[in-house]
Amino acid sequence: MQMTHVIINFRRHLKRRNYSKHTVKYYLNIIKQYVIWLDVPLEMVSPEKMDMYIDHLLRKRMHPTSINLYLAIIHVFYDYLRYEEKVDLINPVNRSRRLRVPRPLPRSLRDQEVEKLFDVIKNERDTAMFKLMLRCGLRVEEVANLTL
């Protein structure tokens, strides 16, 4: 399999699927980096080799979100090879390879924001419900299920 022809055909495939020129350029850049990094043919890449690639990206201090994007693009490329180029291979990138992305904690309301909120609330029932949520950390569903 001639890699230059495969990448050119992959580019055509992306354009036919109406990807923007920036997306096509980005995909091809990532695929080229990946192919250069590989020391084995694409057909020989194992899940362990993908783990090594993830470690390589982590050593470059890439964020897990970016690494997951790289993996998704490589997954698309392997699917292209398998279904369009009819290359007999197993896609080494699966969902279990994706990195866990830490979610930021929600920020708390400032005192002024809380005051504005309570200025808008007119009845005692709603005030009590919002105070429970704000001061006790209850969720909307938990407050809705409360009985007296």
What residues fall within each predicted segment?
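Conserved catalytic core of the tyrosine transesterase superfamily
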Residues: M1-L148
